[in-house]
């Protein structure tokens, strides 16, 4: 099976033909508009989709193709730092406070978490901090076989800060602890922060390139998985992000959680 994660940089309705050329089973798209508030043609393309967002123009969408079925997973919870009396956004939070996450199942078989981490104003837990907070609540749900976490994390270990427990490197280790590893880094042998292939080009400038989009797969899928990153010569015409194409050899899969 083939899965694509891509930050489309808005106006997905104008870019579906380019996506269709990748021939994926499911598309997980960041920064896309809500099909329910868009054109008839885009709604037809979207099919039985899932979507969450902060405005009708920018959200996180899941679009199944080829007869595949996705179902929203009801992941709700809260976390409070132990031993803390006063409660604020740094010491306690709920799933609804965090942006943007979309957990779902595919064909009652694979479990996915689509991610587009966001900046939350002056919150020190912006971007990768949002995912770190999410893990404190939902680590248990993610510790399953046939699990895939993927999306635009807006993060890399090159931006790790001192005295901060929610750095990119810390999150990578927390994911490793629950048997989720980056497919790209597994297949290339490269360390986080030393990537030779980039996924994001600031202002679509080839000289301002970063690796901030990821696919993490559970340990049982690692040997069956490979990831390809789109060519900027093609994809910079559509977005500042490159699509990541995840291919899973399902012939080795035993169905069901």
Where would I find each of the regions flagged by the language model?
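Short catalytic/ligand-binding loop motif for oxyanion handling, primarily in non-cytosolic enzymes
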Residues: 12-14, 35-38, 59, 71, ...
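Structured beta-strand-rich core segments of catalytic domains in phosphoester-bond hydrolases
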Residues: 33-111, 115-117
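Active-site beta-strand/loop signature of hydrolases that rely on acidic residues for catalysis
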Residues: 3-8, 18-38, 112, 134-161, ...
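N-terminal, active-site-proximal structural segment of metallo-dependent hydrolase catalytic domains
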Residues: 1-61, 251-257
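Short proline/glycine-enriched turn/loop segments at secondary-structure junctions
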Residues: 51, 202-205, 233-237
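Active-site-proximal loop/helix segment associated with metal-binding centers of metalloenzymes
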Residues: 110-126, 173-176
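Conserved beta strand-loop-helix elements of the APE1-like EEP
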Residues: 55-75, 202-224, 248-249
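Metal-dependent phosphoesterases centered on the DNase I-like endonuclease/exonuclease/phosphatase
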Residues: 129-212, 217
């Amino acid at each position: 099976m083939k899965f694509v994660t891509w930050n489309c940089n808005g106006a997905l309705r104008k870019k579906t033909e380019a996506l269709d050329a990748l021939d994926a089973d499911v598309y997980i798209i960041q920064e896309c508009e809500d099909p329910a508030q868009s054109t008839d043609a885009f709604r037809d393309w979207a099919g039985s989709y899932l979507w969450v967002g902060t405005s009708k123009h920018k959200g996180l969408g899941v679009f199944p193709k080829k007869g595949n079925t996705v179902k929203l997973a009801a992941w709700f919870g809260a976390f409070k730092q132990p031993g803390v009396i006063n409660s604020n956004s740094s010491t306690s939070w709920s799933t609804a406070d965090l942006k943007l996450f979309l957990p779902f199942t595919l064909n009652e078989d694979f479990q996915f978490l689509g991610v587009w981490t966001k900046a939350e104003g002056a919150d020190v837990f912006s971007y990768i901090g949002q995912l770190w907070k999410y893990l404190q609540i939902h680590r248990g749900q993610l510790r399953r076989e046939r699990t895939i976490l993927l999306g635009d994390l807006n993060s890399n270990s090159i931006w790790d800060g001192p005295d901060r427990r929610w750095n990119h490197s810390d999150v990578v280790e927390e994911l490793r602890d629950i048997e989720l590893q980056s497919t790209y880094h597994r297949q290339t042998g490269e360390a986080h922060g030393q990537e030779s292939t980039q996924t994001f080009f600031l202002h679509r400038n080839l000289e301002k390139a970063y690796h901030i989009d990821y696919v993490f797969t559970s340990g049982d899928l690692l040997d069956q998985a490979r990831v390809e990153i789109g060519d900027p010569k093609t994809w910079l015409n559509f977005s500042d992000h490159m699509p990541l194409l995840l291919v899973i050899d399902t012939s080795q899969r035993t169905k069901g959680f």
